[in-house]
């Protein structure tokens, strides 16, 4: 985040997927070795931590979801599929709202 702030960025976009947002398992990302502050967090907790970290540098955050699952691209054009129901999509957005929308620098969702 420091790099982004130093280069003049004032907003970043965090893409997510519904399946991972609904998971209660800790994230398993190879990049967490460098970002030790993300180790052991769930997917929603990871986004909250990243938004909080961005806030320290005055960076705004936009959350976007264009995938039902991590590998679902381009998909069939719907916001749900055989693995992720419409109810799951609503639950996922509910998690985003509950966990992240109170964070001052989360300014938009898509």
Region spans (language model):
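Active-site mouth of glycoside hydrolases
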Residues: 1-110
